[in-house]
């Protein structure tokens, strides 16, 4: 065993990243300067990894062994599989997906109007050009992912209908044993791997978050959460209340407003919105010049990232100015005299939560046309025919939609253990927002809150593939993040600084998350631009990572 120690260290404005240039221009952000934006293992002898899947016979079944198990076949898992296959082509891997097909969110969420809240030039992969409108429907994203799978022969690695129940690490064997239940037969399937790559996302797909308000059982109509929207739900000519005003509500309301009798948005407090055309003028111009799509994708991606960086800096450095500019944009999109102060002026500063992007101002058009209205108040109780508010007003409804967020899922709610000891991630410290102190050979892909989630899929993949190659060079069979002597006296902090980002779903579940230190090695910085430059240069032999 090698005893050396080694370390080295892609919601709505996010949706409007493609359009950030328009907002930046309105905010006078040309003052801000930004830097250029470029964008399974079985040791068969010391330091060598098997390049084929192996089988281990047990008394009850055959256990397949892979170099890597990738958990999830959504946008994170598919991107991870592409990079693993491209950068480490000799490694065997399998993708275990609980659903009956690929796509993750873009398959399980089926409410009307579902679309991205980030532009696809940055939400898409760096290696696969996006060729359509920046804000995409779920069907368009599914087609994009399908093309990536087909073009890179990834289908043969995916096993659908495998719900993972537990994962246990053995230091004696230097491998993970993963137990999954097959959806079609109910049988337990066991696979082993030296490396576990968690790409299952960060919320529970089976259920959304719905607060328990008084009197809900009295309501005689239908209550539904967007995350579990029934395919046969009929909202035509119905009075609809949508509780919530985040990206989901902003997407859903204009999609149903034309057919419903009326839609009322009921919010406890306002959120920020940004609106613009669902097109990218630079991309259109480049295509008119017959510029190859690979170039168009790269150029527009860089432009959008540059604009987003300037917007983020402005919101953090001059929050009052950014707030007024955003509210002025909303005021211009609504009828004269609309009560913007009550309904569209948040209590918090921009970027403390994601900013919802409204392509072509669709929500504001529904409000202006009288198809939708907005009420800012709190619920006192549900009634037989709707809700009574704390102001005393009552809202009637046939259908109530609780667009109230989701439930955070830490590592897919899987039961983990290390050498027989149950693992509680709240007792660990995150290593660069992707690994955990004391947990060997495991990576969690957790994207960005303010930028496109998938940007980090690319960056983490580059880092982990470099780390795997480094393990080969050292003859190491495991890598474990470990606090250095100079880290031991540091204060353990909550996973994210709530002063700068505090969405409700995260606040409800912060106690389940790993901790952080006030050091870049031991936190998720949530800074794409810093990580883009720093992660490729991280010294793997620095001491935070122990290779054995």
Predicted region positions:
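Short hydrophobic core segments
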Residues: 71, 191-203, 241, 396-405
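Beta1-alpha1 glycine-rich phosphate/pyrophosphate-binding loop at the start
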Residues: 63-158, 267-268, 333-338
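FAD-site-proximal beta/loop scaffold in flavoenzymes
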Residues: 222, 226-228, 385-388, 407-444
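Short beta-strand to alpha-helix junction loop
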Residues: 129-147, 314-318, 350-362
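C-terminal catalytic lobe of FAD-dependent flavoproteins
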Residues: 328, 332-384, 395-410, 493-548
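Feature captures the FAD/FMN-dependent oxidoreductase FAD-binding
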Residues: 134-202
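Rossmann-like dinucleotide-binding core of oxidoreductases
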Residues: 62-65, 70, 79-80, 86-92, ...
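C-terminal, flexible cofactor-proximal segment of oxidoreductases
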Residues: 272-275, 429-430, 441-548
């Amino acid at each position: 065993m090698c005893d050396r120690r080694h370390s080295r260290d892609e919601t709505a404005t996010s949706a409007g990243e493609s359009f950030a240039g328009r907002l930046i221009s309105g905010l006078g952000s040309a003052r801000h300067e930004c830097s250029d934006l470029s964008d399974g293992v079985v040791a068969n002898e010391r330091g060598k990894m098997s390049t084929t899947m192996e089988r281990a016979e047990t008394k009850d079944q055959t256990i397949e062994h892979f170099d890597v198990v990738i958990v999830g076949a959504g946008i994170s898992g598919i991107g991870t599989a592409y990079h693993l296959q491209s950068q480490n082509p000799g490694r065997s891997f399998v993708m275990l997906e609980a659903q009956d097909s690929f796509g993750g969110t873009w398959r399980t969420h089926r409410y009307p109007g579902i679309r991205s809240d980030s532009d696809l030039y940055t939400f898409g992969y760096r290696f696969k050009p996006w060729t359509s409108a920046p804000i995409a429907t779920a069907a368009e994203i599914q087609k994009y992912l399908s093309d990536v799978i087909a073009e890179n022969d990834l289908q043969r690695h995916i096993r659908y209908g495998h719900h993972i129940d537990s994962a246990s690490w053995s230091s004696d064997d230097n491998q993970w044993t993963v137990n999954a239940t097959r959806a079609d037969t109910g049988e337990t399937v066991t696979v082993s791997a030296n490396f576990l790559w968690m790409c299952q996302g960060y919320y529970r797909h089976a259920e959304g978050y719905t607060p328990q308000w008084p009197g809900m059982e009295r309501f005689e109509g239908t209550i539904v959460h967007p995350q579990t929207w029934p395919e046969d739900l009929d909202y035509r000519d119905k009075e609809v209340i949508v509780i919530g005003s985040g990206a989901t509500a902003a997407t859903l309301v204009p999609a149903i407003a034309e057919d419903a009798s009326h839609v009322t948005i009921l919010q406890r407090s306002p959120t920020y919105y940004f609106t613009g055309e669902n097109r990218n003028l630079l991309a259109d111009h480049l295509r008119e010049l017959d510029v190859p799509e690979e170039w168009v994708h790269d150029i527009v991606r860089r432009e959008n990232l540059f604009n987003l960086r300037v917007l983020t800096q402005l919101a953090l450095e001059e929050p009052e100015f950014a707030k007024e500019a955003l509210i002025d944009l909303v005021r211009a999109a609504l009828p004269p005299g609309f009560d913007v102060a009550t309904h569209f002026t948040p209590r918090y500063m921009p970027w403390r939560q994601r900013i919802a992007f409204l392509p072509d101002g669709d929500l504001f058009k529904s409000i202006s046309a009288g198809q939708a209205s907005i009420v800012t108040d709190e619920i006192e109780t549900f009634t037989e025919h709707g809700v009574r508010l704390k102001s005393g007003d009552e809202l009637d409804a046939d259908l109530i939609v609780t667009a109230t967020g989701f439930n955070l899922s830490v590592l897919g709610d899987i039961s983990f253990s290390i050498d027989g000891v149950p693992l509680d991630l709240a007792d660990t410290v995150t290593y660069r927002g992707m690994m955990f102190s004391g947990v060997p050979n495991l990576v969690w892909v957790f994207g960005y809150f303010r930028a496109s989630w998938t940007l980090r899929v690319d960056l983490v993949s580059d880092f982990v593939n470099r780390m795997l190659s480094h393990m080969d060079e050292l003859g190491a069979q495991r890598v474990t993040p470990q606090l250095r002597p100079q880290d031991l006296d540091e204060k353990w902090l909550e996973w994210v600084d709530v002063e700068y980002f505090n969405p409700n779903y995260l606040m409800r579940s912060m106690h389940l998350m790993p901790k952080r230190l006030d050091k870049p090695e031991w936190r998720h910085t949530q800074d794409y631009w810093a990580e883009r430059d720093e992660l490729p240069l991280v010294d793997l032999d620095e001491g935070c990572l122990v290779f054995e």
